[in-house]
Swiss-Prot record:
Alphabetical list of InterPro entries matching this protein: Isoprenoid_synthase_dom_sf, Terpene_cyclase-like_1_C, Terpene_cyclase_plant_C1, Terpene_synth_N, Terpene_synth_N_sf, Terpene_synthase-like, Terpene_synthase_metal-bd, Terpenoid_cyclase/PrenylTrfase
Residue ranges of the motif DXDD motif: 390-393
Protein name: Bifunctional levopimaradiene synthase, chloroplastic
Gene name of the record: TPS-LAS1
Pfam families in the record: Terpene_synth, Terpene_synth_C
Lineage of producing organism: Eukaryota, Viridiplantae, Streptophyta, Embryophyta, Tracheophyta
Residue sites binding Mg(2+) 2 per the record: 609, 613
Motif DDXXD motif positions after renumbering to this chain: 609-613
Residues noted as binding Mg(2+) 1 in the record, renumbered to the chain: 609, 613
EC number: 4.2.3.32, 4.2.3.18, 4.2.3.132, 5.5.1.12
Organism name: Pinus contorta
Length: 857
């Protein structure tokens, strides 16, 4: 059959409107995207009349042969990587042992008890703060300490090297500060001469080496309190190396900082200076400073600072606070207390990132209810009555509370932005830490539409974190973590909309430090945040879930082979990659059926996409669509062999799915499934019409259809029946074709697909994509500008999707997850290109391997 002349044109009739579209020479065989390769050629029926295709008619212009159409060119895809023999070769020997199940249950119980026992915060002793509390003379006037148990603790807890501090961690700054505080206290009470001498020897040895330690390991307020205590030590006659260059440098830093301090700032509003009042005693107006006392009687939750104020003022509330702390800890005090908000938020974040939060839903809700009850629109600190908010706790709280449906505003971040648009941890601070900027960055990805402050925070923190990665000597200001660099790398490469729960869990299992410590005025630990039990459960649970997933994948591979789909030469075989999608986010064992339905439905969207794209004739495709509409297996006899395989597999699979759905929903769902597929096939057909005649629709016309043809809605609407919830018509309408929620999922999936595939598809004859359609509407702009605009549309849609996900509380949680996570998996698959079709040589292959085949050690 001869190709038509390029000077001839055909017409598309849409209602009363007729458009002439030039025909073209050559193949219309299109590119590689998973959901939009609409390069079907027009086929004409035996009645020698133009076939009616959906809403359009294709007729010939004057002089054109209506039967002259291009010849179909066979499409070829890269072969699938995950063949049966490959999967078998990767199957680990791991099996879920009864002892593992028992240990998992034990750990779940123990961690639940940890959550339920959370009060004001569990933490370790601070020798530094305990020394300051031990200084307080008895209020009855006797020449004894008010808290003799704290003095005894100092005498009993000197380390072998003569220092005081945390035995299993050595930071020179921390040890020197604590040791200096302890030897001063012992000297004041004229006791422990041996301990004092050993402490002095340690100080002399380490003070000369301290410059070798990173400045970022210097505790908060060190340059304020350390020189002040040196002055006390000198007055007490302690033989310390006061003339060392390091000591002189610290003294100079203190003087410079105090000179920069406005005289009225200390009393105007609560600042972090309240944390170090013991180092500012010579300049503090004690009457004025009392106006900034916290409700609990402390000064910024610091026992040392509060002890110093009490010794100067005799304030009863200060004494009540110290009694309260010692009642909790016995014979010592921590570096700050309470830590109730910090502990709860970080514990929730820990179990979520490790992928074990599904075991602790009630405990998480209780913890977040507590935090929300103390939420402040100006921000929060580490404790409920802390008057100085910090961006670390605030950003963590904003992100987690928002994702759990609490009403919190991003305006809270304005507290921490300076006049230059930079973000800092504390008001007036000039330094930032990696962990606080990382938490702000993570928070910035759960933006709602129009939240400019979050967008500013995202840009600021991304810039900071990328610079931090380039600085190989960079350390965090607030924490000593096992692998903070790995955490930052993951967050920048896989931000929220690409970070699938199983991948994040695997990454965080590798990066999580069960012995991580934090830096305040001294080094401290939080056992309800950093704990070996979390890690042990995460590893056992990950491997257990992965074992079940491998079994499910083998079942689906058997379904694929027994249905004859491996014989189909025109389609892509991506069973493992497609199964990885639901396994990466709806991973819990109880959703096995939902994962199977999701995977089978997704495989059919790929098969039928490829079938309608370039393989089937219009007569046969019309017959296929009619067979679905009538649900009539008898029509299969009129189909060619490969289409028989497709329809028989389709018919049998969805009959089985419908029967299972009837049992779960308590009503017939077959007609519902049919209707879902009818809409899907109509969208495929419309794009086939456009592609056949090289019609470039307007952007709006394109998106209206393409957000459906991407097929995500079809997958979700059928899979939702198996989420364990009874779905009423009202619930189904909230995630249905007309819902904003489902539309945004399809829109963002379509746009990320198009932005990564349109160039390759255009080179292979494809004419319609979001970029090309937008350029048609705006011929004055360049391709680069059009692409940028499409990215902007997608980013805005993702923000709106966040809001729909968070606020759609009438929809069961699992259904909301299904919609939202399906949108996110598309962002992952298409982050660098067509991750489905080209999965064999893209990072998706490694994700599949890590998620499904490689247990964590």
């Amino acid at each position: 059959m001869a190709l038509p002349s390029s000077s001839l044109s055909s017409q598309i009739h849409t209602g009363a409107t007729t458009q002439c579209i030039p025909h073209f020479h050559g193949s219309l065989n299109a590119g590689t995207s998973a959901g939009k390769r609409r390069s079907l050629y027009l086929r004409w029926g035996k009645d020698n009349q133009a076939k009616k295709l959906g809403p359009s008619k294709i007729v010939a212009c004057a002089g054109q042969d209506p039967f002259s159409v291009p010849t179909l060119v066979k499409r070829e895809f890269p072969p699938g990587f995950w063949k049966d023999h490959v999967i078998e070769s990767l199957m680990p020997s791991y099996k879920v042992a009864p002892s593992d199940e028992k240990r998992i249950e034990t750990l779940i119980t123990e961690i639940k008890n940890m959550f339920r026992s959370m009060g004001y915060g569990e933490t370790n002793p601070s020798a530094y703060d305990t020394a300051w509390v031990a200084r307080i003379p008895a209020v009855d006037g006797s020449e004894k300490p008010q808290f003799p148990e704290t003095l005894e603790w100092i005498l009993q807890n000197q380390l072998k090297d003569g220092s005081w501090g945390e035995e299993f961690y050595f930071l020179a700054y921390d040890r020197i500060l604590a040791t200096l505080a302890c030897i001063i206290t012992l000297t004041i009470w004229q006791t422990g001469d041996t301990q004092v001498q050993k402490g002095i020897e340690f100080f002399k040895t380490q003070a000369g080496k301290i410059e070798e330690e990173a400045d970022s390991h210097r505790p908060s307020g060190f340059e304020i309190v350390f020189p002040a205590m040196l002055k006390e030590a000198k007055a007490l006659g302690l033989a310390l190396p006061y003339e060392l260059p390091f000591i002189q440098q610290i003294i100079e830093k203190r003087e410079a900082k105090l000179q920069r301090l406005p005289s009225d700032l200390l009393y105007a509003l609560p600042t972090t200076l309240l944390y170090s009042l013991e180092g500012l005693q010579e300049i503090v107006d004690w009457e004025k400073i009392m106006k900034l006392q916290s409700k609990d009687g402390s000064f910024l939750s610091s026992p040392a600072s509060t002890a110093a104020v009490f010794m100067r003022t005799g304030n009863k509330k200060c004494l009540e606070f110290l009694n309260f702390v010692l009642k909790k800890f016995g014979n010592h005090v921590p570096c700050h207390y309470p830590l109730d908000l910090f502990e709860r938020l970080w514990a929730v974040d820990t179990v979520e990132r490790l992928g074990i939060d599904h075991h602790f839903k009630e405990e998480i809700k209780d913890a977040l209810d507590y935090v929300y009850s103390h939420w402040d629109e100006r921000g929060i600190g580490w404790a409920r009555e802390n008057p100085v908010p910090d961006i670390d706790d605030t950003a963590m709280g904003l992100r987690i509370l928002r994702l759990h449906g609490y009403n919190v505003s991003s305006d809270v971040l304005k507290t921490f932005r300076d006049e230059n648009g930079e973000f800092f941890c504390f008001l007036g601070q000039t330094q930032r830490g990696v962990t606080d900027m990382l938490n702000v960055n993570r928070c910035s990805h759960v933006a709602f539409p129009g939240e400019t402050i979050i967008e500013e925070a995202k840009l600021c923190t991304e810039r900071y974190l990328r610079n931090a990665l380039e600085d190989t000597g960079a350390f965090d200001k607030w924490a000593l973590k096992k692998n903070i660099r790995g955490e930052v790398e993951y967050a920048l490469k896989y931000p929220w909309h690409r970070s699938m729960p199983r991948l994040e869990a695997r990454s965080y299992i590798e990066n999580y430090g069960p012995n991580d410590v934090w830096l305040g005025k001294t080094m401290y630990m939080m056992p309800n945040i950093s704990n070996e039990k979390y890690l042990e459960l995460a590893k056992l649970d990950f491997n257990r879930v992965q074992f079940f997933h491998r079994q499910e994948l083998q079942d689906i591979r058997r379904w694929w082979n027994s249905s004859g789909f491996s014989q189909l030469g025109f389609t892509r075989e991506r069973v493992a990659e497609i199964y990885f999608s639901p396994a990466s986010f709806l991973f819990e064992p109880e959703f096995a059926t939902c994962r199977a339905v999701y995977t089978k439905t997704s495989n059919f969207t790929v098969i039928l996409d490829d079938l309608y794209d370039a393989h089937g004739t219009l007569d046969n495709l019309k017959l296929f669509s009619e067979s679905v509409k009538r649900w009539d297996l008898s029509l299969v006899d009129q189909m060619p062999q490969d289409m028989k395989i497709c329809f028989k597999g389709f018919y049998n699979t969805f009959n089985e799915i419908a029967e299972e759905g009837r049992k779960r929903q308590g009503r017939d769902v077959l007609s519902y499934i049919q209707k879902v597929w009818e809409v899907q096939l109509e969208a495929y057909t419309k794009e086939a019409e456009w592609s056949a005649v090289r019609y470039v629709p307007s952007y709006d016309e394109y998106i209206e259809n393409a957000s459906v043809s991407i097929a995500l809605g079809t997958v979700v609407l059928i899979s939702a029946l198996f989420t364990g919830e009874i779905l009423t018509d009202d619930i189904l309408s909230k995630i249905g074709r007309d819902s904003r929620f489902l539309y945004l999922m399809g829109l963002t999936g379509r746009l990320v697909n198009d932005t990564k595939t349109y160039q390759a598809e255009r080179g292979q004859g494809e004419v319609a994509s979001a970029v090309q359609c937008y350029m048609k509407d705006h011929p004055e702009i360049s391709e680069e500008e059009a692409l940028k605009h499409v990215y902007t549309i997608m980013d805005n849609a993702l923000d709106e999707l966040n809001r729909e996900f968070v606020n759609n509380r009438d929809v069961p949680d699992t259904c909301r997850r299904l919609v939202f996570e399906t949108a996110r998996i598309m962002q992952l698959f298409y982050m660098d290109g067509d991750g489905l079709t080209l999965s064999h040589n893209m990072e998706i292959k490694e994700h599949v391997k890590n998620c499904l085949f490689q247990p964590v050690a």
